[in-house]
């Protein structure tokens, strides 16, 4: 039974579909998406639909990323300043994928997709491996981590592998290739920026990638 982690998708539905076909998860397998399914790319709405449909019939864990969190805050916001933060982080691309024009006051995610985002956990642990969007604050137990760190932390986390014993698989910070730094494995390889969308199986150390620009598929 495999456990596949998938890095930041950012609206790249075609890449996600291609990668899913490559890893071909079976009935006993688990797929953990590390957050940031939405924003920036061409089809955030399609990505959410694709993941929701697979979650109905298979073991799929979709973690909350900082972009999902910004989206939820936008839907709760009461001031224009609060609402502007998601737009400044490419939230408009998600609304446009649902057919809303920029600035449409009626724009919002469908109730089913909004509920899906609200139910996303901040982390997942599977057989001693921790999966999280951005990372962990060194010296703080997993259960006591600040949600802001789980969603946003960068250098203070991945530059300090000596602070962690468990394998931690994370996204959020894009790298040209999979980052292996002690027990830390970063698999956001910048799909939406012309890189690859990466799937990683930590128990067998398998990596499968679908290339954004040339359609190439790589596995090792």
Give residue spans per PLM region.
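N-terminal active-site segment of His-dependent metallophosphoesterases
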Residues: 1-48
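Divalent metal-coordination and catalytic microenvironments
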Residues: 8, 36, 51, 65-66, ...
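Residue-level marker for buried hydrophobic side chains located in beta-strands
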Residues: 5, 31-33, 62-63, 130, ...
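Acidic, His/Gly-rich catalytic cores of divalent-metal-dependent hydrolytic chemistry
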Residues: 146-220
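Active-site neighborhood of divalent metal-dependent phosphoester bond hydrolases
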Residues: 40-122, 153, 157-159
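Active-site-proximal beta-strand elements of phosphoester/diester hydrolases
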Residues: 2-10, 129-135, 185-187
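Active-site environment of divalent metal-dependent phosphoester hydrolases
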Residues: 10-14, 39-42, 69-72, 138-139, ...
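His/acidic metal-ligating clusters that form di-metal
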Residues: 107-132, 137, 142-177
């Amino acid at each position: 039974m495999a456990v596949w982690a998938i890095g930041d998708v950012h609206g790249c539905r075609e890449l996600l579909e291609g990668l899913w076909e490559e890893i071909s998860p079976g009935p006993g397998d688990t797929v953990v998406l590390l957050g940031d399914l939405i924003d920036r790319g061409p089809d955030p709405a399609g990505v959410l639909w694709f993941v929701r449909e697979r979650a109905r019939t298979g073991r799929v864990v979709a973690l909350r990323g900082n972009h999902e969190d910004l989206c939820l805050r936008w839907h709760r916001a009461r001031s224009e300043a609060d609402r502007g933060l998601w737009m400044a982080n490419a939230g408009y691309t998600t609304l446009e994928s649902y057919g809303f024009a920029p600035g449409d006051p009626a724009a919002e995610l469908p109730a089913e997709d909004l509920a899906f985002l609200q139910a996303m956990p901040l982390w997942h642990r599977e057989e001693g491996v921790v999966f999280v969007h951005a990372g962990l604050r060194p010296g703080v137990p997993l259960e006591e981590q600040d949600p802001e760190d789980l969603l946003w932390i960068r250098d203070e986390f991945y530059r300090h592998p000596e602070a962690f014993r468990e394998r931690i698989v994370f996204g959020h910070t894009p790298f040209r290739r999979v980052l292996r730094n002690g027990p830390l494995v970063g698999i956001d390889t910048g799909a939406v920026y012309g890189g690859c969308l990466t799937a990683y199986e930590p128990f067998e150390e398998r990596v499968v990638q679908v290339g954004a620009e040339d359609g190439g598929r790589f596995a090792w």
